[in-house]
């Protein structure tokens, strides 16, 4: 034994046996025994929940109680009183050696299981004698039966999936542990079992979700797989569109027998590329594993189709170091048709790694998996709804499925359908399930705020006790604490009321469901003894259900504390948390918003009613589905002098239509005055610097397909830049530098220009003789044609913006002063008032007509706000609180009255 390293020998024990010998060593020391004996080890193994030894004891008819008693007595017979362990006994070391010999040579394993230890001990006379000396029960073990039917004996032992503790897969050949030799060939079909997963078996056992809406792609797969040669489809598409789902759908069809006869007995196995690469430490080992997988597939009695997900990892630079030759191993088998493969990768990785190898490209037939339409995605969601209901124990309404698709498509543009809609619905289900039992987030947040305020007050009182001036801080903190406690009381009262209504609502639904002999929210069929309801009782329950839903809806408003079912509101609240867009704005009736759009816009844009009505009409036509669906929602050129509300129109539209001003894509066209800057907008072509990074415009629209595109000062751009928009205005699409088609169909495009402003100013010089917008637009055509090509003007609607009159300036002044009022009241908690004289004074100072409404902002920013700010800061420094602010006009100047708090 001295020639064999003990570390190497004991390293062959699997993790369970190794931990047991470690525990035996500790146990031996605690008992004061000098040597670690077999009895220590077997005692510790039998203390575990399960192992090979447990299974063998059960199968051999050994009495566990008698065995435990015998082992305890054997332990008591050992000498005691030692302060330290001298060594492992020779029996333990010899048992491991014999276990390794029989495990590696008889069973071809690279680990020592506790079952192999038992066989090694029973096959060695001296060890067998020592074992039966521990307990006569061990004499019942039959070594011949154990070796012949070892798999039957160990059954579902937890040691089945373990490996040697030293991390090496095999140790049969000298020098292999050091990596000096290539790994030996695996047994028949061993590579398949080790490196692949049987998808058809998973489909047969119900582990795969039903796949809906990918019939066309599955049919293409079948067409290609039925070829005699080059029968290898490769699925390409963006991450999350469902490439793997197509293959799972194919596996489900094979199991259902819904495939041609030639494919009915086929096994579909997924190759685990990560497992194939893991531990392939030396050159050639990865290729050897792949070759053995290919050989197993080709030699299998049952035809096998191999599914390779993330196929680019097998090709050249796409894989790990040393995997460059992997694709060359596949090529001959793929070309001859002896290895049928379904591959999947993203389009970008396909172009980067596979397309560059023509020999590999011709062996694969591309099947494009596009993002599904909203309609198809809803069908897919209906397919997974029942699975989610069973998992989360909640009820999902059909409106939630539609909301998950539509809201995710609109507000989560960075991901693809159906992946993002499934994630959204899953989160909404989890939130609904939690809300039925947990404390609502609003209540929990309120409690945390109260704790924080109480801590702050305790600190203030401690400071006050040592003479620090804290009266103002204490007053503010006590006010906030009282408000928060009042808010918490209201929340808890509403929570209790909602809980009562939800419990009754769920109980009523359960009764109706039971009466209909349906399946409850958990997916479990109800018993036979359920009470039947007559028609009158059923109608009464339906009426009560409608009444409860109405009460709950009225109580909850747009901020529910408990979600009884997964509905539109539940899904919208998740989107609100993910995107920051208020849930109420999305849940509000979109059609109502569109119908009243001009009224909403007129509150913010002053004096341009004709323009807002024209834009609103176009949006209403598009929303009704009567416009050309392949064009953008609308394309308008807003012409007028500076400061009349052109840019503000874009911001107001984004706020009303798309949920916030963050959905305005602003491109300053004055930056594109040279012809070569076209590539900045749509992305550099191949071979140019910046290729692959996307264009300023195309990337922004790809990320935010529902947005307002504002092309500011478009007259300053180079004529070549104007021409790239022809296709966008006509067909609603633009190709970027990489050839991807960017969809503009859900955008509203506004171009602003100062061209023709002199003509507009002269036509509108007399307010009494103000021409109609159509007349101004007709007059504007001539100056616009000097800058823009007729083809561009013909593709858009020109809307002139009137110069601002005194009445318009007064309305804008009131709007701006109203915003200041809100800021003062929110920041300083004091009232803010102003009289009409202030408005007249502001308008009288607007002498620069070419600046429009911007002059009002300049007057307020440079005059009124600095004076107010100085007074606020001075009073904060002196500790004099304010009770209110009033601004008036006196001697052609702003006059400020600051009321002091008592």
UniProtKB/Swiss-Prot annotation:
Pfam family name, one: AAA_lid_9
GO function terms (MF aspect): ATP binding; ATP hydrolysis activity
Subcellular location: Cytoplasm
Keyword vocabulary terms for this entry: ATP-binding, Chaperone, Coiled coil, Cytoplasm, Nucleotide-binding, Repeat
Coiled-coil residue windows: 441-559
Top-level taxon of origin: Bacteria
Binding residue positions for ATP 2: 640-647
SMART domains: AAA, ClpB_D2-small
Effect of residue 310 to A: Loss of ATP hydrolytic activity and hcp1 secretion
Keyword Phosphoprotein: no
Annotated residues for binding of ATP 1: 237-244
Residue span, Clp R domain: 10-151
Any Gene Ontology CC annotation: cytoplasm
Annotated stretches, region: Repeat 2: 88-151
Statement: the UniProt record of this protein carries the keyword ATP-binding: yes
Family: Belongs to the ClpA/ClpB family.
Complex and partners: Interacts with TagJ.
Function: Component of the H1 type VI (H1-T6SS) secretion system that plays a role in the release of toxins targeting both eukaryotic and prokaryotic species. Acts as an AAA(+) ATPase that disassembles the contracted sheath, which resets the systems for reassembly of an extended sheath that is ready to fire again.
UniProt cross-references to PANTHER family, sorted A to Z: ATP-DEPENDENT CLP PROTEASE, ATPASE WITH CHAPERONE ACTIVITY
Protein name as annotated: AAA+ ATPase ClpV1
Originating species: Pseudomonas aeruginosa (strain ATCC 15692 / DSM 22644 / CIP 104116 / JCM 14847 / LMG 12228 / 1C / PRS 101 / PAO1)
Gene: clpV1
